[in-house]
Amino acid sequence: MTIPFDHWPEWPQHSDRTRRKIEEVFQSNRWAISGYWTGEESMERKFAKAFADFNGVPYCVPTTSGSTALMLALEALGIGEGDEVIVPSLTWIATATAVLNVNALPVFVDVEADTYCIDPQLIKSAITDKTKAIIPVHLFGSMANMDEINEIAQEHNLFVIEDCAQSHGSVWNNQRAGTIGDIGAFSCQQGKVLTAGEGGIIVTKNPRLFELIQQLRADSRVYCDDSSELMHGDMQLVKKGDIQGSNYCLSEFQSAILLDQLQELDDKNAIREKNAMFLNDALSKIDGIKVMKRPPQVSRQTYYGYVFRFDPVKFGGLNADQFCEILREKLNMGTFYLHPPYLPVHKNPLFCPWTKNRYLKSVRKTEAYWRGLHYPVSERASGQSIVIHHAILLAEPSHLSLLVDAVAELARKFCVTH
């Protein structure tokens, strides 16, 4: 049975309130933070304060993308040529390319089989005298083990940058994702639970890092200390010059959308979490299906993607691409909504640093080096797992039952008993 597409929630979602926020920007005559002072605080600063409050930290800097957020975090920490940064082998390529973009070397570590987050037990063996930081990624709907990662980082005097591109609002031991390490980096790209189409956010508790990150994203400028002294038409950004910056500023339109979307984030995350628990219970009853582990330290779990694993032997030798193709046809879902996990970075055709002369000179690694790496858990994950986009978790439970029924039907069709 194929069901109509309109049963599934679309993403992103907006309302009249969203449109009114955008209209405010049009009417303000200030469309960027590099615009002039109008007597009203910029949308960018309003959003930065709101997101900092949401996460319980003093400092927040919006920027152009999650990729940029990671790169600026690395630059603020002084990481560059000759340095190494530990990253998981299973993640979107931006985690690794951000390291390359500061002329440092990403060093891959495999992930845990039941969370798909970096395996802390494997981090220690990857540390060298060149290692400067660890970037744990909170992937799909899981959080990396921040207790163990921070312990390792402290032991070896390493920085921790949390890649929270897929984890806005998750909570580990009463701390929001992004606030547990030195810096948290978020993405607001179209598919994310907090989106403006594109965008990124950086949070930190460190005032000096905040100063540097502000300058790195705004051509070495910062907001002036006292806006009350500004006249209409004055520039609110002032020269600083502590560190060479570039222009990675978020527009006022994007900031307005994020400010609006943030109001509903916790409520929508709660719906996703409840429906994910329903799927966990229902899918775990199907022979050959395993759901992902939720560590006891996680009190709130944000689902960018709901992931389940299947045993290819019990499903007639199907791989993840074939499994997805059958489910998409049955459920009338496009590839945006249902797909396998990423290929491991070292096997992903989108990761090709040897094609840029800059990277060959800075990290000096060839295609044979990258493609010759081997991380078994990450490599199995891409062939034996299914990712369902978080928008589907906003559907009615009766519609989610159709998803469970489709997987169960597939299990019956291909079931191999032992």
UniProtKB/Swiss-Prot annotation:
Q: What enzyme class is recorded for this protein?
A: transferase
One Pfam match, by short name? DegT_DnrJ_EryC1
Alphabetical list of SUPFAM superfamilies matching this protein: PLP-dependent transferases
Sites bearing N6-(pyridoxal phosphate)lysine, chain numbering: 192
Which regions span the lipid bilayer?
none
Catalyses which reaction?
2-deoxy-L-scyllo-inosose + L-glutamine = 2-deoxy-scyllo-inosamine + 2-oxoglutaramate; 3-amino-2,3-dideoxy-scyllo-inosose + L-glutamine = 2-deoxystreptamine + 2-oxoglutaramate
Cofactor dependency: pyridoxal 5'-phosphate
Pathway recorded for this protein: Metabolic intermediate biosynthesis; 2-deoxystreptamine biosynthesis; 2-deoxystreptamine from D-glucose 6-phosphate: step 2/4; Metabolic intermediate biosynthesis; 2-deoxystreptamine biosynthesis; 2-deoxystreptamine from D-glucose 6-phosphate: step 4/4; Antibiotic biosynthesis; butirosin biosynthesis
Give me any GO biological process, just one.
Answer: antibiotic biosynthetic process
Arranged from A to Z, the UniProt key words for this protein are: Aminotransferase, Antibiotic biosynthesis, Pyridoxal phosphate, Transferase
Query: Could you cite one Gene Ontology molecular function of this protein?
Result: transaminase activity
EC code(s) of this entry: 2.6.1.100, 2.6.1.101
| Function, as annotated | Catalyzes the PLP-dependent transamination of 2-deoxy-scyllo-inosose (2-DOI) to form 2-deoxy-scyllo-inosamine (2-DOIA) using L-glutamine as the amino donor. Also catalyzes the transamination of 3-amino-2,3-dideoxy-scyllo-inosose (keto-2-DOIA) into 2-deoxystreptamine (2-DOS).
Q: Which family does it belong to?
A: Belongs to the DegT/DnrJ/EryC1 family. L-glutamine:2-deoxy-scyllo-inosose/scyllo-inosose aminotransferase subfamily.
Q: What is this protein called?
A: L-glutamine:2-deoxy-scyllo-inosose aminotransferase
UniProt source species:
Niallia circulans
This chain is encoded by the gene named btrR
